[in-house]
Amino acid sequence: MFTREVKETVLKRFPTIELSYDKLIHNKVYADLFMIIPKGPKAFLWFTYIENKNVAILLLLNKQGNVKSLDIYPICFEDNLSLGTLMYGTFFDINSYHHFSCEDIFTYKGRYVNNNRLNEKLKIYERIFKNEILQKSYNKNFVIVGMPLWTSSYMNAINTIPTLPYKVYAIKSYNMRDKNGRSLGINLYKEKVKLEAVFKVKASIESDVYNLYCSDNQLYNVAAISSYKQSIMLNSIFRKIKENI
């Protein structure tokens, strides 16, 4: 935990940046790269120094984009990142282990890179995650820093989401030809909820009519019989008919 004095000193050195918010996409846009964004609070991850120590500071943001808390977290990284590397992304947990998913980068070793083309940023990410950050957690205090999952099509992103070990907030779209490297916007992801229920089933006098009852014996509805095969199966369970014997 920071003392009030140290916190104020650290925030005075925080880079002056303009945080742009992604617009919601309602219509089809031309994009050739898609980022799957995890669900969780937004945060900055700042590799810097305090006195003579190189540190990684996680700054959690509120919904207005203001810093609501900051803490030092153990992360395996090369010291030269502390020349001033600032990432923006999502903080979330998987099986009680902390993760930070880097969606954007503002400064890299003291150099402002946020206006770089997307392909230039991707090269920086590759350098960082190949050589300068070790994605390892020695205990549950550590933060594992990584990239969101990228796909080349929107449908690939949609089909991939159910296989991920974390909840998803949105899909962010990019056009590699854009010079400023910024996203075209995001599509919020709505998780499909599968509803399951157990009913009491009672056969009606009419053929292929089965009434469904709740646990308090209140009638809910009538079961749908969509095929002859289902009709035979339900008859064999709930009725005694010679043709089914």
Regions found by a protein language model. Name each.
Residues N80-L83, H99, P165:
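A short, structural micro-pattern
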Residues H98-S101, I105:
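Elongated alpha-helical scaffolds
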Residues V55-D93:
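Conserved loop->alpha-helix
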Residues G89-T90, S101, G110, N116-S137, ...:
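Eukaryotic endomembrane system proteins
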Residues V6, V10, Y125, F129, ...:
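Generic structural signal of hydrophobic/aromatic residues within well-ordered alpha-helices
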Residues M1-F14, K23:
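Hydrophobic, proline/glycine-rich low-complexity stretches
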Residues P15-G65, F92-N95, Y108, K130-I245:
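Nucleic-acid 5′ end/cap handling module spanning
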